[in-house]
Amino acid sequence: MLGSKTTAGKRAMAAVREALGVIERRHGITHSWLSEKALHTFDGFITKDNTVVGVFEAKSRAASYEDGCIKYGGVLYPTYLITSKKLENGAVWARKFNVPFFLLVNLEESGHVLSFMVSDKAGKILVDFEEKASTTQATVNGGYMTRANSFIPISQALVFDIK
């Protein structure tokens, strides 16, 4: 089942859409989401003045932004962990559409959104990251999976305070 169809998935989607809505109103952009009825390798398009200016992947976490780190479960993390395949897929789509790829992370507990410009319009990865195999939660619904994950320094994000 698609994560967006479960209670946890619906809650996360609502939270990230609300957070990105604040950024839209402040900066005159629109996040156009792909259909939730199927799996996609990125979440949608960023448009400005009816022109596509980026592709994006959006996440929402029950975490906060503190001292330049993500605070989750009482622990400060200087990096954001994401499946490496998400970065690779986003860069491919950036190249295909000739626009940058952004990773947007809503930190629900503090009212911040991290925006990483992951690749340029040619699909060239712009962020530094460490890649290693690690076991993490498989989906918003739980389960565990060992896979290649990328650890991106929080210092590479543009931080939006959306409170």
Language-model features: where?
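Acidic, metal/cofactor-coordinating or nucleic-acid-engaging core segments within structured domains
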Residues: 84-104, 113-120
